[in-house]
Regions:
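Extracellular/periplasmic helix-loop-helix junction of adjacent transmembrane segments
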Residues: 20-47
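Paired small-residue
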Residues: 76, 87-95
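Conserved MFS/SLC helix-loop-helix module at the cytosolic interface between two early adjacent transmembrane helices
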Residues: 48-82
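Cytoplasmic helix-loop-helix junction between adjacent transmembrane helices
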Residues: 94-129
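Juxtamembrane intracellular "pre-TM" segments in multi-pass secondary transporters
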Residues: 178-205
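Conserved small/polar residues in nucleotide/adenosyl-binding loops
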Residues: 2-6, 264-268
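Helix-loop-helix hairpin linking two adjacent transmembrane segments in secondary transporters
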Residues: 126-170
């Protein structure tokens, strides 16, 4: 359950505040389109953080990076909740993502450390399910909070969720990477492998294709609040339902995709 919460924190942080973007824009005195830049600001931190947490956790263990990331996440969430400057909000969102992505990276690594391959496959399936369900529920939860309080409460909620993860990590998780399996190579050597991957056509062609697909989804996430709520006059509550249906379709088609893949021979 702790792993599930660590995984869920990323999708919750992306999608939960989307219904609040128009009211945030009004508070800051800017256009909703400009306030939507807080979405790609988050993705910047998400991309950069994942490049480093993996090698770092392989070197010093899993728990320490997990604590550092979660503390950073809580601090950044509080900054989002209290700032009165839109640019500080954008920076805070990037820092929030740098903290949140530790849950995805380190939780996967801890599962690989602990479980047999068959159990690991089941655990990863549950993680994918959590990552699919969280975007469905997050906008609805955000719109419910908007009914009773301002948009700032959403970020206070996320800060509280981060604190809960820290407490649960302290109570129920322990170090899973023993000293004998730690990677003590210099960090430069580890990071140079990223460059080797970029030169490998068997990797980068599929990666480019997947990146374009994911990029289109992120563009939709950034543009949807202004397009749907302001363009069509949809309320935040109705927007959360529309967004949830999109997320449900994404999850459903991901499951359907398992059927043709099972009949396809993949080249090693």
């Amino acid at each position: 359950d702790v792993y599930k919460r660590q995984i869920a924190i990323g999708p919750l942080s992306i999608d939960m505040y989307l219904p609040a973007l128009p009211s945030m824009a009004k508070d800051f005195g800017v256009a909703t389109a400009f306030m939507s830049n807080s979405v790609p600001a988050y993705f910047v931190g998400l991309v950069v953080g994942q490049l480093f947490y993996g090698p770092i956790s392989d070197r010093i263990g899993r728990i320490k990076p997990l604590y550092v990331g979660m503390v950073l996440y809580v601090i950044a969430s509080v900054m989002c909740a209290t700032t009165t400057n839109e640019y500080v909000l954008f920076v805070s969102r990037t820092l929030q993502a740098l903290g949140a992505c530790v849950g995805t990276v380190v939780s996967r690594a801890m599962i690989r450390d602990r479980l047999h391959p068959k159990q690991m496959a089941k655990a990863f399936s549950l993680m994918v399910l959590v990552m699919g369900i969280a975007p469905i529920l997050a906008p609805s939860l955000g719109s419910l909070l908007l009914k009773v309080a301002s948009w700032r409460v959403i970020f206070w909620f996320l800060a509280g969720f981060g604190i809960l993860n820290i407490v649960l990590t302290r109570l129920f998780l322990h170090e899973t990477l023993t000293d004998e399996f730690r990677n003590n190579r210099p960090m430069n050597d580890v990071l140079s492998q990223y460059w080797d991957l970029l030169k490998d056509t068997q990797f980068n062609y599929p990666a480019i294709g997947a990146g374009l697909l994911m990029g289109s989804m992120f563009v939709y996430i950034s543009a949807a609040p202004e397009l749907i709520m302001e363009g069509y006059g949809v309320t935040p509550q109705h927007f959360s339902w529309i967004f949830g249906m999109n997320a449900a379709g994404f999850v459903g088609l991901t499951q359907v995709n398992q059927w043709p893949v099972s009949y396809t021979h993949l080249r090693a």
